[in-house]
């Protein structure tokens, strides 16, 4: 069975490898590109906390810092949205984060932060302009746009080609963010939409699922909001 991976190319390989091991045929079809902003300065001394809502936020901040500033990050209180972001933070900055919620959403992260932070403490959130405002609106926080999400060139035409490639077989579409889903479904024509409804969609979590539902589709959601959680759902579809 074919499984379409719509996450950015540089983050698709791990998911593709997991799918291959399970006997699926992964198709890497990015509907999003990550573009890092390297022309930024930040005064880390102004902040008590740094909160990361994606691995790209970790990488983006690392890219703009000097060696001394990277060491300084280790002395900050660190909050991350989920397991992959935690692993990325440890890979780049050499230690575990202080906070990670059990449910990988901004709302859950905010609840955990509120339990241990003080009202006067200042937060830095390295993120993208398309980020949700949950943390910004509820914390004493500054956003630092260390990357942006761009739509790949010729995506509309490529989606037409994808339809021809997968239409005759059973397939699964996977989406790991609301933006990957939005960029995909806005170019889906009526014919492709009907084909998709006879197949399967797996969203990484409830926020991504809501975006998909706005386009009239009903995705499946894993219990754990990771690609490994998605794989658990995908395994069950193999038997159908």
Curated annotation (Swiss-Prot):
* Enzyme Commission number, as recorded: 4.2.1.75
Species: Methanocaldococcus jannaschii (strain ATCC 43067 / DSM 2661 / JAL-1 / JCM 10045 / NBRC 100440) (Methanococcus jannaschii)
Q: Does the keyword Lyase apply?
A: yes
Could you give a single Gene Ontology term from the biological process aspect?
protoporphyrinogen IX biosynthetic process
The family classification in the record reads: Belongs to the uroporphyrinogen-III synthase family.
Xref: InterPro entries: 4pyrrol_syn_uPrphyn_synt_sf, 4pyrrol_synth_uPrphyn_synth, UROS/Hem4
Q: What is the role of the protein in this entry? A: Catalyzes cyclization of the linear tetrapyrrole, hydroxymethylbilane, to the macrocyclic uroporphyrinogen III.
Instruction: Tell me the superkingdom of the source.
Output: Archaea
Name the chemical reaction catalysed here. hydroxymethylbilane = uroporphyrinogen III + H2O
Q: Which Pfam families match?
A: HEM4 (PF02602)
SUPFAM superfamilies, A to Z: HemD-like
Q: Which UniProt keywords apply?
A: Lyase, Porphyrin biosynthesis
An annotated Gene Ontology molecular function? uroporphyrinogen-III synthase activity
UniProt protein name: Putative uroporphyrinogen-III synthase
Enzyme class, one word? lyase
């Amino acid at each position: 069975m074919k499984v379409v991976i719509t996450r950015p190319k540089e983050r698709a390989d791990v998911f593709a490898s997991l799918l291959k091991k399970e006997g699926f045929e992964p198709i890497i079809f990015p509907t999003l590109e990550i573009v890092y902003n390297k022309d930024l300065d930040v005064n880390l001394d102004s902040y008590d906390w740094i909160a990361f809502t994606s691995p790209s936020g970790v990488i983006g901040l690392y890219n703009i810092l000097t060696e001394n500033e990277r060491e300084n990050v280790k002395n900050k209180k660190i909050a991350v949205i989920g397991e992959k972001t935690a692993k990325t933070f440890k890979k780049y900055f050499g230690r575990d984060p202080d906070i990670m919620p059990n449910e990988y959403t901004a709302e859950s992260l905010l609840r955990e932060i509120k339990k241990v932070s003080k009202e006067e403490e200042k937060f830095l959130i390295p993120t993208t302009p398309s980020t949700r405002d949950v943390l910004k609106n509820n914390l004493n926080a500054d956003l630092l746009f260390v990357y942006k999400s761009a739509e790949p060139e010729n995506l509309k035409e490529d989606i037409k080609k994808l339809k021809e490639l997968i239409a005759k077989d059973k397939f699964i579409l996977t989406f790991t963010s609301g933006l990957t889903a939005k960029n995909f479904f806005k170019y889906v024509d009526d014919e492709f939409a009907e084909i998709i409804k006879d197949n399967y969609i797996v969203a990484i979590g409830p926020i991504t699922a809501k975006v998909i539902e706005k386009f009239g589709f009903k995705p499946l959601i894993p219990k754990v909001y990771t690609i490994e959680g998605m794989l658990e759902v995908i395994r069950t579809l193999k038997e159908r």
